[in-house]
Structure formats: structure tokens, C-alpha cells
């Protein structure tokens, strides 16, 4: 310890900087600094401390930590009582911690249920026990969890500016840079303005591009009604092929040939996303983890791969030949080419492409996997889908307008998104003192004070299964409910407010097109895994057992 203190004493604190942001100028009187007082205390007491055992020092240190926690909470409570925002707010129901200091019991339960693939069910059951909004304390940091649509509306819309992305930026930034999913404030506004024009109908309605990759997918699926096929992995490959085609004008072709470079990118992208998901799961312990060298290399492979396409797009803009010699992309519009017309910032283009690729691959694959999981267990729904497609399309592939008119098909999509939202749980962080409209008091209907720095967790998975919102059969797959009911903030598969998903129409169009073409191609679909649904939660939700089915051709 003496060595550490000596280093602190000798360190030139004026040399500190945060990237390009210089550190604040030190106080002119170093005697008033915390570091100086620590050093002075050590100089005075280091000799006397040598007589005490390590255990005694450890106990004293732990006691000091507990006292510090108690003092912090007392000061926070005093601040909360006197905050003008808190007038009218009532206490929030708290999770019944056994460890009231660090909240390790709460953390342990989360870790164990996650490993058992029951994390979302545990969250849902907690809401049923504690109420739709409750508080926790972990490592002396306050958190609020909610499945209340009014509170979620407040977080995402009404008081949108009161919240930031929290820890998402340091975790996802190494791969996604300054893209739309990892930016706040002006950076985020710039990203959204840059990307919005590229999700116009002309881009979203390119069904021929989807059909091209779907044809490759269908070639890999036996139609004899006897062979078992695992659809979940095929859907991931399909959405990666179609998303890269949509974004880069060049598909990875993971369902067919694919070059070695394309395959390397696909593998690196999957590894990078797994590493990001792991960091989110680790939470506060992420700082103790050694950097994963393979994951860091994967980040660089992904960014370098996309940079090659950005260079080609900029060359096309300036009338130069493609560095890759790819002639297939020059005559049609695609996302990257349009983006390159809007900005010269190559790093920004690369970052935005990687951000959209995550949504284009993972969320749509999650939806398709969950959709076919439930359809394989509801043959009567499958026959209704086939009947609607046959009546309205007469065996032809649908165009964009026809697709929009297939009401029962859309109801099946909505019902799947309700039960299995691709992003079932999300977080924000309060950037200032603010309030939630509900959750306080004995009945949970009074406003709640939210201090600056508080982590907000909102769980659409639990909200979508609330019987008071969706009826006593909320846990059941029943597409017919969408024929008579309309939902607002109770149904939130694509987020809401200013940050609502830009690509939701693309995802819905692609999923509906795939569903219709499958219904036209296969007479029956049968589940081949009798096990109940078990969650696999990474960045998106999937079935831990996959989607094993048998399909019989029409």
C-alpha cells in the first residue's frame, strides 16, 4: 500500500486527460486535495498500523465501507425529501433484499436464472409478486424495473430527454462506433436524420431481393414430410444474406457459395455479438474481465470488411471504378450507395452500416424463429394462413400492396411479437432528477422520484403477457385477438417515442413475405421437439432448443 501511496504522491495529476478532453485544472492548494490528506494520514499512521493483523485491517476496511454506504443512503434520502420534483411522489416498493448493502442476492438470482434459461420468466414472476414497478439496490446503485406502459411511455417519449443509453456506449462502441444504437443527443439526432431517408417505401418494398435469398433458403429445406430440419440457424443465415444485400449491395451468400472473405466476416460478426452480449450479462463485473483477444480481432475484421464497401461506394460517387471490381451493384439502389450520397464521413457510414446490420440480421431472425416455433404447434393457424394466401394471391408471389392486405398474416406476426419480442428487456439511465407517473404508494399508482444516475429497466416481455392488458389468455398464442383489439404503449416490439425502430417496416415486410411464401410452398409443418419453450437470450431472444420441424410440400 505504501508503494501505491508513493506513486499517487509522485504522479503529475496535470497530465491526466480523457481522450481529447483535458482534465480539469487541479486546485491551486494541493493541501486541500483528498489525495494529499490520504498521503498525510498514511505518513502519520503507517508505523502504528504495522502492529495490526491483515484480518483486523480487512475488518476495519469493510466496516468503513458499510458506514460509507449508510452515509450515502442517508444523504440521498435527505436530498430526495427536499427535491422539488419529489413533491407528491411516494415511496417505491423495493425488492426484498437479503443483502441490503450490495444486493448480491438479487445479482445471484439473475445469474442463476439466466444460466437456467429462465431469466425472463423470473422477471415476469417478480412483477406479478412485487407489482409492475419496483426498486432494487445493487452495489449501492439504485435501479427501477417496470412493466407499466405509462412508465415506459414516460421513459421513451414524454421525458425522453431525461434519459440516456447508460452502459450501452462503452460495451457496444468498440464495434459500432458512433452509430445510431450507441449515441445520444446531437450525435443521435444526426444519425437518425442521415438514416431515415433510406427507409423509404422504394427501399423497403424491394421484394425481388428478398425472393432471391428466400429461393436459396427453400432449396435447403426437405419437403418430404419426414426429414427434420432446424429452421432457426437457417433463418439467421437468410437474414444475414438479405441484410448485407440490402445494406452493401453485396450479399454474403451464407446459404450458398460465399467467398472466404465473406465467411470470415460472418464468423467474426457472430463472435463480436456474442462478446457484446456477454459483457451486458456481466454487468458491474465487466471491469474485472480480461479483454477477449479473439473478440477484439473480430471487431477489427468487421470494421475492415465494411470499410471496403464504403470505399467502393465513395468511388462510385466520384465516378471511379470499384476497387473490388464488383459490377453487380452499380445499376441498382442500395442502402450504402444512398448513404454515400449524403455524407463524406467514411467512419460515420461504416458505423451506421454495422448498427443497422445488427437489427437487420438478429431481430428479423428472432421474429422468424419464434414465429415458426409457434406455428409448428398450431396446425389450425397454419391452414388459415394457407387459405388466406390461396384466396388473395392465387398461387402468385405477393407484391408490396398485396402483402399489406393479408390481415391474418399480419395478426400472426403481431401475436408472435407480443409473446416473443426480439428485444424483451431494455435499459436507460436517468441523466437528471426526474419522475415516473406510477409505481409509488401502497397501490402503486402514485408518482415516483427518479434520482440522477438511476438505472431504468423496462421489460416488454412481461408487459406483453399481463392479463390485465391482454386478457386471461395472455400467455396463449391467439392471432384472432388482433382482429378486434387495438393496443398503444401496451404493445412495444420495436421500441417507441423518438427512438422507435427506423427499420420496423423493413423487418415486418421481410417476415410477412417469408411467411406467405412458406405457406404457399408447404402443406403442413410439424414440431419435432416436444420440449416447452426455453429462452436463449443474447442481444435478441431465441429458442434455446432451436426450431426443429418437418415440412411437407404442397
From Swiss-Prot:
InterPro entries: Cyt_P450 (IPR001128), Cyt_P450_CS (IPR017972), Cyt_P450_E_CYP52_ascomycetes (IPR002974), Cyt_P450_E_CYP52_fungi (IPR047146), Cyt_P450_E_grp-II (IPR002402), Cyt_P450_sf (IPR036396). Pfam families: p450 (PF00067). Keywords: Glycoprotein, Heme, Iron, Membrane, Metal-binding, Monooxygenase, Oxidoreductase, Transmembrane, Transmembrane helix. GO terms for cellular component: membrane. Pathway: Secondary metabolite biosynthesis. GO terms for molecular function: heme binding; iron ion binding; oxidoreductase activity, acting on paired donors, with incorporation or reduction of molecular oxygen, reduced flavin or flavoprotein as one donor, and incorporation of one atom of oxygen. Its EC number is 1.-.-.-. Glycans are attached at residues 110, 328, 414, 425. Belongs to the cytochrome P450 family. This is Cytochrome P450 monooxygenase himC. It comes from Aspergillus japonicus.
Amino acid at each position: 500500500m505504501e508503494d501505491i501511496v508513493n506513486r499517487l504522491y509522485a504522479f503529475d495529476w496535470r497530465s491526466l486527460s480523457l481522450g481529447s478532453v483535458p482534465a480539469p485544472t487541479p486546485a491551486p492548494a494541493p493541501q486541500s486535495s483528498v489525495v494529499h490528506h490520504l498521503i498525510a494520514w498514511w505518513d502519520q499512521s503507517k508505523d502504528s498500523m504495522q502492529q495490526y493483523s491483515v484480518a483486523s485491517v480487512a475488518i476495519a476496511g469493510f466496516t468503513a465501507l458499510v458506514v460509507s454506504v449508510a452515509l450515502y443512503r442517508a444523504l440521498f434520502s435527505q436530498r430526495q425529501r427536499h427535491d422539488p420534483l419529489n413533491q407528491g411522489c411516494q415511496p417505491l416498493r423495493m425488492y426484498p433484499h437479503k443483502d441490503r448493502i450490495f444486493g448480491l442476492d438479487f445479482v445471484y438470482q439473475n445469474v442463476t436464472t439466466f444460466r437456467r434459461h429462465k431469466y425472463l420468466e423470473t422477471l415476469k414472476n417478480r412483477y406479478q409478486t412485487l407489482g409492475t414497478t419496483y426498486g432494487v439496490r445493487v452495489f449501492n446503485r439504485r435501479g427501477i424495473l417496470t412493466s407499466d406502459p405509462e412508465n415506459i411511455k414516460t421513459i421513451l417519449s414524454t421525458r425522453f430527454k431525461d434519459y440516456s443509453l447508460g452502459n450501452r456506449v462503452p460495451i457496444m462502441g468498440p464495434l459500432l462506433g458512433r452509430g445510431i444504437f450507441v449515441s445520444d443527443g446531437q450525435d443521435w439526432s444526426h444519425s437518425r436524420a442521415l438514416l431515415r431517408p433510406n427507409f423509404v417505401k422504394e427501399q423497403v418494398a424491394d421484394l425481388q431481393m428478398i425472393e432471391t435469398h428466400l429461393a436459396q433458403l427453400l432449396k435447403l429445406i426437405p419437403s418430404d414430410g419426414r426429414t427434420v430440419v432446424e429452421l432457426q440457424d437457417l433463418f439467421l443465415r437468410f437474414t444475414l444474406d438479405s441484410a448485407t444485400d440490402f445494406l452493401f449491395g453485396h450479399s454474403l451468400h451464407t446459404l450458398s457459395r460465399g467467398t472466404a472473405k465473406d465467411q470470415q466476416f460472418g464468423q467474426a460478426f457472430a463472435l463480436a455479438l456474442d462478446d457484446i452480449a456477454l459483457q451486458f450479462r456481466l454487468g458491474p463485473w465487466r471491469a474485472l474481465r480480461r479483454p477477449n483477444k479473439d473478440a477484439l480481432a473480430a471487431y477489427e475484421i468487421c470494421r475492415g470488411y465494411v470499410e471496403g464497401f464504403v470505399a467502393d461506394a465513395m468511388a462510385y460517387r466520384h465516378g471511379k471504378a470499384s476497387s473490388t471490381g464488383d459490377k453487380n451493384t452499380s445499376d441498382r439502389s442500395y442502402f450504402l450507395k444512398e448513404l454515400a450520397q449524403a455524407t463524406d464521413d467514411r467512419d460515420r457510414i461504416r458505423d451506421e452500416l454495422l448498427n443497422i446490420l445488427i437489427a437487420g440480421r438478429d431481430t428479423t431472425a428472432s421474429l422468424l424463429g419464434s414465429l415458426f416455433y409457434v406455428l409448428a404447434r398450431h396446425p389450425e393457424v397454419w391452414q388459415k394462413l394457407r387459405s388466406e394466401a390461396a384466396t388473395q394471391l392465387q398461387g402468385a408471389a405477393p407484391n408490396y400492396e398485396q402483402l399489406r392486405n393479408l390481415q391474418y398474416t399480419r395478426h400472426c406476426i403481431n401475436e408472435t411479437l407480443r409473446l416473443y419480442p426480439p428485444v424483451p428487456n431494455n435499459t436507460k439511465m436517468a441523466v437528471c432528477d426526474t419522475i415516473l407517473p406510477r409505481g409509488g404508494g401502497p397501490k402503486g399508482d402514485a408518482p415516483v422520484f427518479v434520482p440522477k444516475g438511476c438505472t431504468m429497466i423496462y421489460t416488454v416481455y412481461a408487459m406483453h403477457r399481463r392479463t390485465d392488458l391482454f386478457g386471461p389468455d395472455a400467455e396463449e398464442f391467439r392471432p384472432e385477438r388482433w382482429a378486434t383489439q387495438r393496443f398503444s404503449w401496451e404493445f412495444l416490439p420495436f421500441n417507441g417515442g423518438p427512438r422507435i425502430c427506423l427499420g420496423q417496416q423493413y423487418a415486418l415486410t421481410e417476415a410477412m413475405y417469408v411467411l406467405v411464401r412458406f405457406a404457399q410452398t408447404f402443406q403442413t409443418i410439424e414440431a419435432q421437439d416436444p420440449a416447452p419453450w426455453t429462452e436463449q437470450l443474447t442481444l435478441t431472444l431465441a429458442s434455446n432448443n432451436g426450431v426443429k420441424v418437418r415440412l411437407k410440400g404442397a
